[in-house]
């Protein structure tokens, strides 16, 4: 009898050893499969959000190009200029034009720096109501005043004369709905629509009221400032991002377009490193850990908690001892507990999906559109298409760098510098070359 009992115990130990070994093999195989799924999800997530960002940028630029080619009001200057472009004297000297344009660009840059620093100071000392009031006034002017001017010029260009009451009613509803969607609550698509139209209107204002050469200098110096403000250790926009992450809060509305949701953060393409405010409960902490808030680019795709999944099919044979039965029961409980978080994790993943996305500042929308709109004002489609392609290539390259470095990066420099190079090369080299070749009947 003792020998029989020892044989049974030895057989039970061997069986348990084989079970644990088989479980480890299954677990390793499942972990490898999970890693492959995560990598595939990262690629799909990144590609989808790049497309979701290209579409609104293209729509904003298309609206500006369409307006520049159909409404003469925005393509003609009429001698009016912005207050912060004081050097507008007429001259034929290229050197004087260049110096005056550079002076105007530097004055405008000083205004941008001053407003940025003022915004940082308000945010640092938590003057949130003052900041929101400032942004609400800006949105109000864009949605009511500038939209009214735009609609008026559109009606003039297409020779349409509706009732004044009808126009006022429509513009009033449009403005009120926009204020609600941007600063309060509203459907996602409607929020995105209003942010795109606001960016296009602001770009049209810059194109109309900035002097001819000043536009190009402004684009250059603003791109350089974007580099300094984001990448330097004491840069204001970098400080803004870090402060917001420390406080674990969004900054302000009406500043950011997100490919996932309108979730205001910064004036640059940024990576969010904030942790999720929901803490795991004690029951969940045994099987999974709460994962941090996701980045706003494809390089930080959310990773589901790795849970060891063991098949629930556990056979308890009649000749096993009571201890073996007890161990099997414990194993079943652990398996069921490991399976439970998947439902909660799925809901949490859906919640995170609503708040993630590649975030691009409205300033980037505006200056992309300024570049393309100014290029289209000369009615040269070769130059316009070249600038459009350059902007998208630069934006795509910026997103690649964002995924590699996983930190806030400026979205203007690469796209704007590429657009400027493509513009001048196409306008001064390629277009004259193609024209001459066509005139010589060498190209059909």
UniProtKB/Swiss-Prot annotation:
Any ranges marked Lumenal in the topology annotation, and which? 67-101, 152-163, 211-212, 381-384
Where is it expressed, tissue-wise? Expressed in most neurons.
Catalytic center residues: 226, 364
| Region described as Disordered | 275-331
> Which loops or segments lie on the Cytoplasmic side of the membrane, by the record?
1-45, 123-130, 185-189, 234-359, 406-413, 435-444
What's one GO MF term for it? endopeptidase activity
UniProt motif (PAL) ranges? 410-412
Can you tell me where the transmembrane regions are?
46-66, 102-122, 131-151, 164-184, 190-210, 213-233, 360-380, 385-405
Primary localization class, coarse? endoplasmic reticulum
The record's keywords, sorted A to Z, are: Endoplasmic reticulum, Golgi apparatus, Membrane, Notch signaling pathway, Transmembrane, Transmembrane helix
Q: Which family does it belong to?
A: Belongs to the peptidase A22A family.
| Assembly and interaction partners | Homodimer. Component of the gamma-secretase complex, a complex probably composed of the presenilin homodimer (sel-12, hop-1 or spe-4), nicastrin (aph-2), aph-1 and pen-2. Interacts with sel-10.
Function per UniProt: Probable catalytic subunit of the gamma-secretase complex, an endoprotease complex that catalyzes the intramembrane cleavage of integral membrane proteins such as Notch receptors (lin-12 or glp-1). Provides the major presenilin function compared to hop-1 and spe-4. Required cell-autonomously for correct neurite connectivity of the AIY cholinergic interneurons and their correct functioning in thermotaxis. Required for mesodermal patterning of muscle function. Promotes basement membrane gap formation during tissue remodeling.
Query: What name does this protein carry?
Result: Presenilin sel-12
The record lists the organism as: Caenorhabditis elegans
What is this organism's lineage? Eukaryota, Metazoa, Ecdysozoa, Nematoda, Chromadorea
Name of the gene? sel-12
